[in-house]
Amino acid sequence: HRLFQQLLKQAVEEASFCMMVQNASALLARTGLLFHRQVADYAYDENWKRMFTVGIDYIDGEKWISDGKYYSCSTTVAAMDMTFALISDNLDVSVAEKIAEEIGYSWDSSF
């Protein structure tokens, strides 16, 4: 477990951004990188969250949220919207809208 956590932490530290879908934030939480960060809440064992994710601000009711380079979403369905938001943030909203249109996805860029 420790080797995986070390490799994950190093990869995320070196990355320009980090996307977490549903309970993937639980994996990253163990590295300490999410301490004092906001993360979209997800359905998971509440006891486990209390034990291993102290110091992480889980935001209830949000489909997705970004905090710095960290993007998290509460469901797999919300991952598409989060992805287009990341494209918009890092490239341009027009690029995200064009890609969404090309694949036939109805993305609301106002979020």
Residue positions per predicted region:
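Active-site-adjacent pocket-lining segments in enzyme domains
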Residues: 1-111
